[in-house]
Amino acid sequence: MHQKTFYYRHLLSPLITLALVTITLAGSLSGQSLVVYPAPQGSPGNDDFTVKVRRPGEPWQDLYSYGVKVDQVIEARHTPQNSSMAYFDFSGTVDVEVTWNKGDLHAVRIRPLSYDIQPVIKGNTIRFSLSQPRNLSIEVNGEIFHNLQLFASPVETDRPSANDPHTIYYGPGMHEAGTVIVPGGTTVYIAGGAMVDGQFLISHVENVRIIGRGILYQSGKRPATAQPPTAQAATSPTPGGKTGNSNRHDDLLVEFSKNVEINGIIVLPVTYTVLMGNSQQVTIRNLKSFSAGGNNDGIDVFCSRDVLIDNVFMRNSDDNIAIYGHRWGYYGNTANITVSNSTLWADVAHPVLIGTHGDPPHPDTLEDLKFINIDILDQSEAQINYQGCLSINVGDANLARNIRFENIRVEDIRLGQLVNLRVMYNRKYNTAPGGGIENVWFKNLSYEGSHANLSVIAGYDSSRSIRNLTFEALTINGRLIWDKMPGKPGWYETADFAHMFVGEHVEGLRFIRSSPEQSEPEKK
């Protein structure tokens, strides 16, 4: 199917619908449910692993192991690798069995390590149990590119009817959707066992949901450099005379919209997974994403407010989560963004990046940003200017303030920095230096590893500085870092023990053990 923009509905096969419902309801009386989804014919597979699940004491059920591309950078070039992914839904308790099919199994780890999942190993097979939803990486013999990503999601509770006139429904199977403009008041449902080749444009509308358990991808039949059909609303001036950005190939574009939910699907993008601009009241929950090419970001937020990103798994070949001011046709401040309960894996660039883009003639403020309960599995970025698992790099006269990082666990990254806070002037992206960074609080930030480079904290000049920066209960390889820590000579800077360089124009930096008198940054 060539480039088309249209609305339509796919009917779910009645037999598959019945099978899914039967699997789900069979355990409802006992509070135990297990839903597995047959893969559509023609879906890409990977035979590195054999994966099975069961309710305790019942027969094993096979999971299809999909092939997904992840990015290994070799000599500064993107080199996609064939990784594995499987998914299912459950409630109660489930047993998982994974067999490695590519030789002897010498060692295995299941990440995030904070979950402390200790499998039973017998030969080339491992077993473990889950009692709550988890997004996992199962790595045999230290292999991080040919690993298994296993997504154990909660059972769906709000699956819409295929006959609902306000639903665009993709049942199990392969679908070539093209570019779909989603009307306001519409639910797009991608069922488990579905693979949808296309992109969804949510532009100048309200009350839209894109939900399900299936896979959204773009096959490459349409060249990435070509311009897709332009959403009508996106090319019309807004009341402020601005236009959007619908001439891209992001799988999910949310712009100038309100009350949008993205929930449960898996995305294999060709550019950004989600591009969000000038939108508000947006919730992204239980989204999973893999990418392996240049500029294949995860979720990028421009000039938006009241956004919740929760329980996502992002493994991308560029920034996992990026929060910006002005770029392209998006203008205005960014505020009240929360990222929580998530797993981030940056094969290139940053797990978290704040700042960079803005509007120097009309400076933007990025404020009230929260990052809570996050596992960072990796950063691998050879360019020093783009290192930092947690980065606030303000340019273009941006002011970033009132930012909180809490309960962030960083595992042993391959190449990068723990934090990078700079008021900067990056001539590749900026036309002016940043405005400043104020009131940033890191609480319970931990790093376990030996490969992180020196972190950097630096202002630009006396009027473009970093002010009021607190690290509370910072731990490096289990050691608590604070201003009065035992064994620190008085003439040493505390930052020396945190492997941080603190440059000029940084005021109010402190490392504390706990803070009973104040638990978050003071707001202006």
Model region roles, listed by residue range:
Residues 13-26:
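Bacterial N-terminal signal peptides
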Residues 2-16:
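Bacterial N-terminal signal peptides that target proteins for export
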Residues 29-524:
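Extracellular/periplasmic carbohydrate-active domains that bind, remodel
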